[in-house]
Amino acid sequence: MCQSSWVTRQSRRACARDARVVCTTVGPYTKYGSPLVAACVETGTDYCDLTGEVNWTREMIDRFHEAAVDSGARIVHSCGFDSVPADLGTLLVQSFAAETFDAPCETVRIYLDGGSGSVSGGTLASFGELFEAAATDPLARETLRNPYSLAPSGERSGVDPGAQRWPRKDSLRGGWTAPSPMAPVNERVVRRSNALLGYPWGREFRCTEVVPTGE
C-alpha cells in the first residue's frame, strides 16, 4: 500500500514505481483517471480499473498503447462487472468450443440474468461525463456509435452491428430479450480481446449481450 499526493506528476510516478499493480476504483475516469494511467505507463507498472466510460478507454488506447507495449505495463480497463464476466466468459466458451468441436463459435450471446446490485455515486457521475462528452465531442460520439471503437487502430470495422436497442424475440432461447445496460461496454471489450489475440474467433465473429424478459 502506498500513499501519495495526487497533485504532482512526481508523486504519482513514485507511487506507481513502488507498486507491482495499481487498482483504481475512483471515477469518473474521464476526470480522474488519465494521470494515473500515464504514471503506470511511464514506470512499466501494471494497471486495472472499473471504468465503463468507452470514450475515455478509447482515448487511453490511442494515447498510451504503444508506450505501454514499450514499457511493459499491462493496462487493463473495465475489470469489474463490466467487463470481466463477459470477456472471460467468452474466452472460456470459445476455448471449450475449439477443444470440443475444433472450431470457435461464430456467435456468442451473453444473457444477463438473475443479478442485482446498486449504482454508486461514482458510476452516476461517470454517466454524466459520458453524456456530456457525447454532446460536445465529435470523437466521443464516433466512439459510441462504432461497435469496434475499442479495437486497435486500423481494426475498427466489422460485421457486428452493435448492441441490441429494442426488445426482441430471441432466436436461440425462444423468449423475449431486452437491451442490456452493460452491452455497449462489454461487447466492445470482447471485440477488442478478439483483435488483440489475433482473431482466433475469426473476423466474422459476433458478440451480443441481452437481458431475458420471459416468454
Residues of each region from the PLM?
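Active-site-proximal alpha-helical scaffold in enzymes
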Residues: 86-96
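Short glycine-rich anion-binding loops that position phosphate/pyrophosphate groups of nucleotides
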Residues: 28-29, 80-81, 153
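Gly/Ser/Thr-rich loops at beta-strand to alpha-helix junctions
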Residues: 54-56, 80-87, 115-116
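Rossmann-fold NAD(P)-binding glycine/threonine-rich loop
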Residues: 33, 38, 51-73
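Hydrophobic beta-strand scaffold residues
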Residues: 46-47, 75
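C-terminal catalytic/substrate-binding lobe primarily of soluble NAD(P)-dependent oxidoreductases
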Residues: 70-72, 95-215
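Conserved Rossmann-fold cofactor-binding substructure of NAD(P)-dependent oxidoreductases
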Residues: 3-21, 25-32
